[in-house]
């Protein structure tokens, strides 16, 4: 969980606006997973937590092996509905690749034993991620979170029946082979799609010059009001979710209600929410 959200203000804003009904707070280390669990107990049935060791933080488990036992206890909690984000990130070298792989596999084993969905973080490491995932025969549902890759990379995930989760990165992707193409050409079906804000990152800049006009006009005034009043480039918020859904709908040439209904159903099913 990002330190920016250690207080309740960001939760209260989104719930008061009624733009979201449930919030997933991810843990990216033992400490932040514990804090995410604490928040989920303050807001039962509204906030849910995940327990993850982000690739960047993998070395912390090697440095303090006993912390893994505390992590297992957190992950086993009822309020924790998924394991992750976990995976591999070769864009930065906060943890050595071999260490990342070791801790990634430990989390996959844990998720499989608990039967909880897996949130995958992958940057410039797809083949190694796939090689590790392919070792497991009976994985729980796998979600590729905050996907920023190419359409070709997405197909490799979709062929394995994984889910793809998209963010406001849509506004930044200017390539002909990336996320936008996934939506434009129907490569990404609704029954494999999730939507997230990845707050406080991935602010959806609806004023981006390369954002198609039909996408800009597809964003409602109400969603823009939430976005511009409560979010900034430095601090995205959960209340940006409606704008992201509307952009995705415009790219897919579907109604926002259809996208919202499908992605909400997927989330409820995958994470066992009521």
Question: What does each model-found stretch correspond to?
Answer:
Residues 1-274:
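Mid-domain alpha/beta scaffold segments of enzyme catalytic cores
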């Amino acid at each position: 969980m990002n330190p920016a959200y250690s207080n309740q203000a960001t939760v209260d804003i989104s719930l008061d606006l009624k733009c979201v009904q449930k919030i997933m707070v991810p843990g990216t280390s033992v400490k932040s997973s514990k804090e995410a669990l604490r928040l989920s107990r303050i807001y039962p049935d509204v906030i849910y937590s995940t327990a993850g060791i982000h690739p960047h933080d993998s070395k912390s488990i090697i440095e303090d092996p006993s912390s893994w036992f505390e992590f297992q206890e957190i992950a086993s909690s009822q309020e924790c509905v998924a394991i992750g984000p976990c995976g591999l990130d070769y864009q930065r070298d906060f943890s050595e690749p071999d260490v990342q792989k070791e801790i990634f596999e430990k989390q996959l084993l844990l998720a499989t034993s608990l039967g909880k969905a897996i949130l995958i973080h992958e940057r410039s490491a797809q083949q190694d991620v796939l090689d590790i995932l392919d070792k497991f025969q009976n994985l729980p549902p796998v979600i590729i979170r905050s996907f920023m890759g190419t359409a070709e990379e997405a197909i490799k995930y979709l062929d394995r029946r994984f889910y793809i989760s998209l963010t406001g990165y849509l506004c930044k992707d200017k390539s002909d082979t990336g996320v936008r193409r996934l939506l434009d050409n129907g490569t990404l079906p609704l029954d494999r799609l999730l939507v997230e804000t990845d707050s406080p990152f991935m602010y959806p800049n609806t004023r981006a010059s390369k954002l198609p006009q039909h996408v800009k006009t597809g964003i409602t005034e109400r969603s823009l009001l939430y976005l511009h009043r409560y979010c900034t480039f430095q601090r995205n918020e959960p209340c940006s979710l409606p704008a992201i859904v509307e952009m995705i709908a415009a790219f897919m040439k579907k109604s926002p209600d259809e996208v919202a209904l499908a992605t909400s159903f997927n989330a409820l099913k995958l994470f066992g929410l009521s």
